[in-house]
């Protein structure tokens, strides 16, 4: 079998003093924390599309990336080479999961029947490679946004034929995700939204989206797919407005259509910031709803208004993200998928490794800091004290539903002073900084 990365050694943990760009500084996959190796807390995954398909094209320029698998001109040879490259890449980095869209892994034929046959051949190759490897499928998905047929949407299109095409495509994607043992299946509605309301039947589009998701739930039951269904919110791009705007919007939609019990969320950092939220906000919202499923690990650039999908290197953000994951009880059928691409000018194969190492180290460090914060109950203690008034007296009655407007008026009407606690934001922020510094100082 062809080797795609002969110059890259197996990436080792060398510790915080290491200056080797091809080594982990903070991430030791086998380090046991809370009875579990770090690799099982973090469940890193490679995104097939960014790492093996994307070639560094942007709206202004041609591909820049050096990718040895693209030397093959035959589309099938290229597809198989990408699969082989994925397995070699994951093994060298000690990454146990990957994610893909149907159209990332195999070229399209003239009809859907032909496309499905081609897809089956590549799925066979993946299954073959899985046999003697630890690499597993985190989640699969269908690309319902690249082909021109999806210009008006997929489940929310104006064309019943396109709706049928999308349904058949998801049906097949569910089958192959099941066949490959995928832990989850993602719905990201890249074209499920609108450009202008002047030409949009908003009511019908939303109803059709619900019909589509229900059919997916029913088909998954029928074939015995037990993976977790995940909605990935994003407010805009490529459409001006996307229906799964953020966690709160998507949750209300699911509730409204009686679909909430079947779905959790796949939260992407860059999508959170595009929605005007922090990554932490989206994760917290999903957590309190009991719906934190998986994460697309990346970061955006706050000065740019689009989805830059950069490798996550911001310790503060990964700390707050892992804090939410820990408080949610950790990942079950989910993980940290690097939906991230190296910059167009980082065009060497080596940069793919460096990007993933940077992301893995940053999340490992974030996890360690967050673990201490959670264990010491730093924020919990503060929050509990801040809301103490709801634990006794009138507050307790409010919480237990034992009071009403009249009783509350009677209680408060002659009271002269109300005593309030301080929010102490600055104190908590500097405490967080101390935990970051303390954790780093204790690292090997
Ligand atoms: C695009 C999305 C997409 C989903 C999967 O912005 O992040 O890649 O994760 O379809
Ligand atoms: Ca994503
Ligand atoms: Ca993205």
From Swiss-Prot:
It comes from the Bacteria. Mg(2+) 2 binds at residues 268, 271, 307, 309. It is found in: Cytoplasm. It is an enzyme of class 5 (isomerase). Signal peptide: none annotated. One of its GO terms (molecular function) is magnesium ion binding. Pfam families: AP_endonuc_2. Binds 2 magnesium ions per subunit. The keyword Metal-binding applies. Its cofactor is Mg(2+). Its main location: cytoplasm. Its EC number is 5.3.1.5. It catalyses: alpha-D-xylose = alpha-D-xylulofuranose. This is Xylose isomerase. It comes from Thermotoga sp. (strain RQ2). The lineage of its organism: Bacteria, Thermotogati, Thermotogota, Thermotogae, Thermotogales. The gene is xylA.
């Amino acid at each position: 079998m062809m080797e795609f990365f002969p110059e890259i050694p197996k990436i080792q943990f060398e510790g915080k003093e290491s200056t080797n760009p091809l080594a982990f500084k903070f991430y030791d996959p086998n380090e046991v924390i809370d009875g579990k190796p770090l690799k099982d807390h973090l469940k890193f995954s490679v995104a097939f599309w960014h790492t093996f398909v994307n070639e560094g094209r942007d709206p202004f320029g041609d591909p820049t990336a050096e990718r040895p698998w693209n030397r093959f001109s035959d589309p099938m040879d290229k597809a198989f080479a990408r699969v082989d490259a994925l397995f070699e890449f994951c093994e060298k980095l000690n990454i146990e999961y990957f994610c893909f869209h149907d159209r990332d892994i195999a070229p399209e034929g003239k009809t859907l029947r032909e496309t499905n046959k081609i897809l089956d051949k590549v799925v066979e190759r993946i299954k073959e490679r899985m046999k003697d490897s630890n690499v597993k499928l985190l989640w699969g998905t269908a690309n319902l946004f690249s082909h021109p047929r999806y210009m008006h949407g997929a489940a929310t299109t104006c064309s019943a034929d396109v709706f049928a095409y999308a349904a058949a495509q998801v049906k097949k994607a569910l089958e192959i995700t099941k066949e490959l043992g995928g832990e989850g299946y993602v719905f990201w509605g890249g074209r499920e939204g609108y450009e202008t309301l002047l030409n949009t039947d908003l009511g019908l589009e939303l109803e059709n989206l619900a019909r589509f998701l229900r059919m997916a739930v029913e088909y998954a039951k029928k074939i015995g797919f037990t993976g977790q269904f995940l909605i990935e919110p994003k407010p805009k791009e490529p459409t001006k407005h996307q229906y799964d705007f953020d966690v709160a919007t998507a949750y209300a939609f699911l509730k409204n259509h009686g679909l909430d019990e079947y779905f959790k969320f796949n939260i992407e950092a860059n999508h959170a910031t595009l929605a005007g939220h922090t990554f932490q906000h989206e994760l917290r919202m999903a957590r309190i709803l009991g719906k934190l499923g998986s994460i697309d690990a990346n970061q955006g650039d706050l000065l740019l208004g689009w989805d830059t999908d950069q490798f996550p290197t911001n310790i503060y953000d990964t700390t707050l993200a892992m804090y939410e994951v820990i408080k949610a009880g950790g990942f079950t059928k989910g993980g940290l998928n690097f939906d991230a691409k190296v910059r167009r000018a980082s065009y060497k194969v080596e940069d793919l490794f460096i990007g993933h190492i940077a992301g893995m180290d940053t999340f490992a460090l974030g996890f360690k800091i967050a673990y201490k914060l959670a264990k010491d109950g730093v924020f919990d203690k503060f929050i509990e004290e801040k809301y103490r008034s709801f634990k006794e007296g009138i507050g307790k009655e409010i919480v237990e539903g034992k009071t009403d407007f009249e009783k509350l008026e009677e209680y408060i009407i002659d009271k002269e002073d109300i005593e309030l606690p301080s929010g102490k934001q600055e104190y908590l922020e500097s405490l967080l900084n101390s935990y970051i510094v303390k954790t780093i100082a204790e690292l090997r």
